[in-house]
Amino acid sequence: MTKNILIIGGSSDIGLEINNLATAEGHSVYATSRDEAVSNSYDNFIHLDPNQSLDALDDIPEDIHGLVYCPGTINLKSLQRLTLEDIKAEMEVNFYGAFNVIKKVLPNLKKNDGASVVLFSTVAANTGMPMHSSIAASKSALEGFAISLAAELAPRVAINCVAPSIVDTKLASHILSTDERKEASADRH
């Protein structure tokens, strides 16, 4: 059965890989990003900022089987350098955007028993790591939201939150720029 999958964060390497896997299985992917440069990577691309108007999502299919929320941020700063604006920006991307999108497409998800939402968190949300305060706070909010929402929407819609460590992507390239840095990151986890 062909399923309709909505990916928020389609310009991320993770979003692109999920698209590749889903389309290889014959599913229809609808991907969004604030970056229109990736539009040619998708059959169904939607230019969207999850914290602005979500009207562009009015054109997705009425039945969505899966939602993947995977926009990413890496803003590593000490507490002395961290500003309230930094925290707000992380919350906008990592938490408020997820809230906005899920609320908007929930009717589409509820049309399918067994629909699924996958949210991307980080290991930093539950592991004390230097200079990860803002991402840990925003992703912890996302995890708490996921747990409560899973209880609220079960058994019709499954809500899951995955928390990978740093992934070797363009977003993390400045952190994993040398073999030594990659090894240090691997040793940490």
Describe each region flagged by the PLM.
Residues 78-79, 83-91, 181-185:
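Substrate-binding pocket helix/loop in short-chain dehydrogenase/reductase
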Residues 102, 138:
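Active-site helix of classical SDR
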Residues 107, 150-155:
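Alpha-helical segment proximal to the catalytic Tyr-Lys
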Residues 11, 15, 19:
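N-terminal Rossmann NAD(P)H-binding glycine-rich loop of SDR-like oxidoreductase domains
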Residues 80, 127-133:
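Active-site loop immediately N-terminal to the catalytic Tyr-X3-Lys motif
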Residues 122:
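Residue(s) in the substrate-gating loop at a strand-loop-helix junction
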Residues 153-167:
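Conserved Rossmann-fold SDR core element
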